[in-house]
């Protein structure tokens, strides 16, 4: 039986409106009451994930910034690993002046965006943080958890991904969370590493973990768990890379909650009442 439930947020647990629906909320709370451990695993900043958790008034583990930080049930930081300062600087200079690509940084509790851009349609609606402008020549690159690039020009982002891998190799992990967002963290961290850490702390085997995701940054987490579930709306490359994973409903239709209800709490009177 699975005891740890780990889920990505955007495109997975969250609705297309970037909310936890009432139905999903009730399923999560019911399972936590029954002794299951929940893990929110996301590329989002810690502050964003914390606010989602606090809105639900629950205790969950949190894997933030694609594994750069991991928090326990009591909101204690139990792991962090930042990008090397030199690497973060190089990343931020790669496309800083490209008019089609927005360079963005998570450092400590702040979100930064390159100062030659005004239109940033990708992130303000997804985040409770408000960005500040930065210039890499005078920026302090200590404790940068993630550098990410957003663009409507997907061809440029795919070329950038190849360039980063060629230039930095395994010193970084670089993945698309969604087609228009390329994310880079330290090569020593990932959602999968965060899940391993949590399973070790709890003394629960990874075989007793079930995972849910939709993006390429979810692949390593999905690949190490006892059961992997991919959203109907997931990246086609993810489905191709993990052919054994079960494809479930879309986030538009509460896919995760519907699956959990059917497979974990079927015929329970509490669930039947809503």
Swiss-Prot record:
GO terms for molecular function: magnesium ion binding; phosphatase activity. Mg(2+) binds at residues 8, 10, 214. It is an enzyme of class 3 (hydrolase). It comes from the Bacteria. Keywords: Hydrolase, Magnesium, Metal-binding. PANTHER family: PTHR47267, PYRIDOXAL PHOSPHATE PHOSPHATASE YIGL. This is Putative phosphatase BUsg_029. Phosphate binds at residues 9, 42-43, 191, 217. Coiled coil: none annotated. Belongs to the HAD-like hydrolase superfamily. Cof family. The active site is at 8 (nucleophile). Its EC number is 3.1.3.-. PROSITE patterns: COF_1 (PS01228). It comes from Buchnera aphidicola subsp. Schizaphis graminum (strain Sg). Pfam families: Hydrolase_3. Its cofactor is Mg(2+).
